[in-house]
């Protein structure tokens, strides 16, 4: 892969901004246009194994496409993965997710000094495996004072409002009936956040959340879900596996009845083979 900039009017051939890494993802412009950040990694790693957050200074020369200089790594390594860089409103720092301390937590790094600060804690996951480009699990709102985040707790997604100044967290009850959310995106004016959401009895849908009022709106539903009484409610479970390691799973207890079936229903086991 290479990181490049393209003239949307077609006047110039695309210009390479960075090369040398096997893979690139999630490029971001700062709002002031002075910096570009991105994530890169090398084979045989996948981005959730080990990846690097980088940032470079943008140089503009008249009508010619810009170039980058002073590109440097701000976090990440062969055994540390990073995810979803987002510039602060003033462009002096970057927010991102790093699993440096085990779970993927939200961090902030100063571009000038490289000083890093962890903003969330606990045995919760604020990122997700980057299977494809531009997955998003959080959005900065209220002038970067707060973040609306998708947090994974024991395999179930919740939407949480985090005060980035003091770390205070608040689960959003209006979104608690969704067990899976993705593609979190904030409107240009910072007043609305959209996402793709679904639940144990709710088909996948496009939703919008109004930041000032907290009101939830459904824009589009992909399909009609079966009746709730016919659906099993998922339950997280943890058990000891080989070598004393903990294994995690999701259990779906039987619901309803089958005519003619005697004794307990069969237990169907599905094992996920990886790599995540």
For the regions a protein language model found, what residue spans apply to each?
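Non-catalytic accessory segments flanking enzyme active sites
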Residues: 1-3, 25-26, 120, 133-136, ...
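Conserved beta-strand position repeated across blades of beta-propeller domains
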Residues: 28, 86, 139-140, 185
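Beta-propeller fold detector
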Residues: 15-18, 64-73, 116-123, 170-174, ...
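Short loop/turn segments that connect beta-strands within beta-propeller blades
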Residues: 7-10, 58-61, 110-114, 163-167, ...
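Residue-level detector of Asp-centered blade-edge/turn motifs that repeat once per structural unit
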Residues: 31-32, 89-90, 142-143, 188-189
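A flexible loop/linker signature enriched in serine peptidases of the S9 family
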Residues: 1-3, 18-24, 37-55, 73-82, ...
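Short beta-strand element of the alpha/beta-hydrolase
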Residues: 262-273
């Amino acid at each position: 892969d290479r990181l490049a900039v393209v003239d949307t009017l077609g006047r110039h051939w695309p210009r390479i901004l960075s090369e040398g890494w096997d893979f690139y993802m999630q490029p971001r412009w700062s709002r002031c246009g002075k910096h570009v950040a991105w994530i890169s990694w090398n084979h045989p790693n996948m981005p959730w194994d080990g990846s690097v957050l980088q940032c470079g200074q943008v140089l503009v020369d008249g009508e010619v496409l810009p170039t980058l200089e002073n590109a440097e790594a701000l976090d990440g390594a062969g055994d540390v993965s990073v995810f979803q860089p987002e510039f602060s409103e003033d462009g002096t720092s970057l927010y991102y997710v790093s699993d440096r301390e085990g779970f993927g937590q939200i961090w902030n790094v100063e571009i000038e000094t490289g000083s890093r600060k962890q903003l969330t804690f606990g045995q919760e996951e604020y990122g997700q495996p980057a299977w494809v480009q531009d997955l998003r699990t959080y959005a900065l709102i209220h002038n970067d004072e707060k973040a609306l985040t998708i947090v994974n707790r024991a395999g179930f997604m919740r939407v949480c409002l985090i005060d980035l100044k003091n770390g205070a967290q608040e689960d959003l009850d209006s979104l608690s009936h969704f067990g899976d959310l993705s593609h979190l995106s904030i409107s240009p004016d910072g007043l609305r956040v959209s996402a793709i959401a679904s639940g144990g009895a709710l088909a996948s849908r496009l939703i919008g959340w109004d930041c000032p009022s907290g009101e939830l709106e459904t824009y589009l539903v992909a399909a009609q879900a079966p009746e709730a009484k016919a659906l099993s409610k998922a339950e997280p479970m943890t058990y000891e596996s080989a070598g004393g390691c903990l294994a995690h799973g999701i259990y779906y207890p039987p619901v309803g009845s089958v005519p003619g079936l005697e004794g307990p229903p069969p237990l169907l086991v599905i094992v996920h083979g990886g790599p995540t």
